């Protein structure tokens, strides 16, 4: 699975998890159309899952996509063992000091303005969403 597709699926499922139908309903509150019941001429409503069940399903699907993407990333990082002889490091996980030093020596900190801006706007968004 492509990393961009996995990220898109995660954001799609998170938006389904965070956006409830009540919050996204436009217009005035109250029942409209067939939700009024049969006494006013509406159709009988079909059985739907409760919001808690739908939210739990969306959360489970998001967790499954996240675990799948994590497993894909971990398998992509693994290197095949191409040595013909099996020495002392056959049962090791290749975390000797030289490998660690080679992987971390070129590491740089990426602190862009977008990261700082999102770190500032995310709590404000949460406060506006959950404010009474």
From Swiss-Prot:
Function: Prion-like protein that has PrP(C)-like neuroprotective activity.
Tissue: Mainly expressed in brain. Also expressed in embryo and retina.
Family affiliation: Belongs to the SPRN family.
Lineage per the UniProt record: Eukaryota, Metazoa, Chordata, Craniata, Vertebrata
Protein name, UniProt field: Shadow of prion protein
InterPro entries per record: Shadoo
Domain of life of the source: Eukaryota
Pro-peptide positions on chain: 108-132
Keyword Signal annotated: yes
Leader sequence segment: 1-24
Record organism: Danio rerio
Low complexity biased stretches: 33-50
Annotated region described as Disordered, given as residue ranges: 26-50
Membrane topology term: Lipid-anchor; GPI-anchor
Intracellular or extracellular location(s): Cell membrane
Glycosylation site residues: 93
Keyword annotations from UniProtKB, A to Z: Amyloid, Cell membrane, Glycoprotein, GPI-anchor, Lipoprotein, Membrane, Prion, Signal
Residues with lipidation of kind GPI-anchor amidated alanine: 107
Keyword Cell membrane: yes
GO cellular component, one term: plasma membrane
């Amino acid at each position: 699975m492509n990393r961009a597709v996995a990220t898109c699926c995660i954001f799609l499922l998170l938006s389904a998890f965070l956006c409830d139908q009540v919050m996204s309903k436009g217009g005035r509150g109250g029942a409209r159309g067939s939700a009024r019941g049969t006494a006013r001429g509406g159709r009988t409503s079909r059985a739907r899952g409760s919001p808690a069940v739908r939210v739990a399903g969306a959360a489970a699907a998001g967790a499954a996509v996240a675990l799948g993407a994590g497993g894909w990333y971990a398998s992509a990082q693994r290197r095949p063992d191409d040595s013909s002889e099996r020495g002392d490091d056959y049962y090791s996980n290749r975390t000797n000091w030289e490998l660690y030093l080679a992987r971390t020596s070129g590491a740089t900190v990426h602190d862009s303005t977008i990261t700082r801006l999102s770190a500032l706007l995310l709590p404000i968004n949460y406060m506006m969403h959950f404010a009474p």
